[in-house]
């Protein structure tokens, strides 16, 4: 009978510990200042920016785009004096004879 009583008292002790933990955790919530989880007075969370990963540039952005971008560059070049360096396709020098 005493063993059973010890077992019951042990269970009661465990229950009381669990209840004490719950009470302590609720008290901890009340100890945390309100400004950690509430918006500033008269404001909202919209001013706080989340950290986001920088967009990885595509191959076109890295290597100067496709045919369309080159055509746009050629049109711009036709209005200016000399072509941009990226559009020098032939070596500078005398033209080859056919």
Curated annotation (Swiss-Prot):
Signal peptide start and end residues: 1-19
Region (Disordered) location: 40-98
The organism's place on the tree of life at top rank: Eukaryota
Compositionally biased tracts (Basic residues): 87-98
UniProt keywords, alphabetically: Signal
Protein name: Putative uncharacterized protein LOC644613
């Amino acid at each position: 009978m005493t063993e059973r009583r010890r077992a019951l008292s042990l269970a009661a002790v465990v229950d009381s510990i669990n209840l004490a933990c719950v009470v302590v955790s609720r008290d901890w919530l009340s100890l945390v200042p309100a400004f950690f989880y509430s918006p500033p007075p008269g404001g909202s969370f919209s001013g706080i920016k989340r950290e986001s990963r920088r967009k990885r540039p595509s191959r076109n952005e890295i290597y100067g785009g496709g045919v369309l971008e080159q055509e746009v560059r050629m049109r711009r070049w036709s209005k200016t004096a000399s072509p941009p360096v990226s559009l020098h396709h032939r070596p500078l020098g005398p033209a080859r004879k056919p």
